[in-house]
Amino acid sequence: MFRHSSRLLARATTMGWRRPFSTDLPAETAADSTFVEAWKKLIPNVDPPKTPSAYMAPRPATPSSIPSKLTVNFVLPYSSELAGKEVDMVIIPATTGQMGVLPGHVATIAELKPGVMSVHEGNDVSKYFVSGGFAFIHANSFADIIAVEAVPLDRIDANLVQKGLAEFTQKLNTASTDVEKAEAQIGVDVHSALNAALTG
């Protein structure tokens, strides 16, 4: 198989055709024109339907330069913590791990898990504990972060966190139904993340 690869590669590079990527738009709609001609031969009195390629729009041009700042909107169900704030970087606790977002980041949707979100602006770092939510990172250097609950890290009482962790651990150990176990597990997960945020 490998001994033929150089010959196949040479043949592929010298041929005049190019296989487009799945996201590329076709240079010409040859398949559409063939379809329209066949349609008009069979049913000349009815306009041909539009094919999927008729609805495709060209991709917007990629900006030539990356903005120097990331614009962040950080929203809770009951308030807006940050609205149009220009920052250098945001680190979010995604379910896939800690995710740093800089200006020019690729468009992404990330689910948030309980953890610390840090907002970096120059030498200042603001830290929030988020219980969960979603982050929508747009290609134009905007980030919309929606959290179920968020508290500035400096407003969290470490003693209450320890007390809550012990309480939910006890509930988890004594839970008898699946619902009780699930509720206790959520409490343990959130308080463990709070404890880790305060101690580390």
From Swiss-Prot:
The record's InterPro entries line, in alphabetical order, gives: ATP_synth_F1_dsu/esu (IPR001469), ATP_synth_F1_dsu/esu_N (IPR020546), ATPsynth_dsu/esu_N (IPR036771)
Q: Which UniProt keywords apply?
A: ATP synthesis, CF(1), Hydrogen ion transport, Ion transport, Membrane, Mitochondrion, Mitochondrion inner membrane, Transit peptide, Transport
Q: What CDD domains does the database record attribute to this sequence?
A: F1-ATPase_delta
Q: What does this protein do?
A: Mitochondrial membrane ATP synthase (F(1)F(0) ATP synthase or Complex V) produces ATP from ADP in the presence of a proton gradient across the membrane which is generated by electron transport complexes of the respiratory chain. F-type ATPases consist of two structural domains, F(1) - containing the extramembraneous catalytic core, and F(0) - containing the membrane proton channel, linked together by a central stalk and a peripheral stalk. During catalysis, ATP turnover in the catalytic domain of F(1) is coupled via a rotary mechanism of the central stalk subunits to proton translocation.
Can you quote a single GO CC term? mitochondrial inner membrane
Using the record for this protein, list the coiled-coil segments as residue ranges, or answer none: none
Q: What is this protein called?
A: ATP synthase subunit delta', mitochondrial
Transit sequence range: 1-21
Q: What is the scientific name of the source organism?
A: Ipomoea batatas (Sweet potato)
Assembly notes = F-type ATPases have 2 components, CF(1) - the catalytic core - and CF(0) - the membrane proton channel. CF(1) has five subunits: alpha(3), beta(3), gamma(1), delta(1), epsilon(1). CF(0) has three main subunits: a, b and c.
One Pfam family here: ATP-synt_DE_N
- Say where the protein is mainly found: mitochondrion
